[in-house]
Every structure is written in structure tokens, then in C-alpha cells.
Amino acid sequence: MNVYSVFIFAILAISSASGIFLPGGGGKKCGGYGGGYGSGVIIGAERPKK
């Protein structure tokens, strides 16, 4: 589903942006957890789907 892929890409982009724009407390809380852990979950979920 294209919509699903776009949604996942948006989450990844937002997670990355959070770490870039908020390198302080916000970056560690949102970018660190969302970018590190969320990234693995997204890749793991997207691979079997394809």
C-alpha cells in the first residue's frame, strides 16, 4: 500500500527531524528513542511486507 509506505516514511522523517532540530533534551527523548528503536521496528515491519 502506497499510503502505508508514505505514512512510515513520514514517521521516519519526523523522528530524524526531532533529533536534528532538538539535539538537547528533546533530541534524546524523541529523536533518540524514536529514531533508534522506531527505525528498527519500521525496517523489520516493512521487509516481510514486501
Curated annotation (Swiss-Prot):
Spans through the membrane: none
InterPro entries on file: Celegans_Fungus-Induced_Rsp, Fungus-induced
One protein family per Pfam: Fungus-induced
Top-level division of the source organism's lineage: Eukaryota
PANTHER family given in the database record: FIP (FUNGUS-INDUCED PROTEIN) RELATED-RELATED, FIP (FUNGUS-INDUCED PROTEIN) RELATED-RELATED-RELATED
Protein name, as recorded: Fungus-induced protein 3
The organism of origin for this protein: Caenorhabditis elegans
Gene behind the chain: fip-3
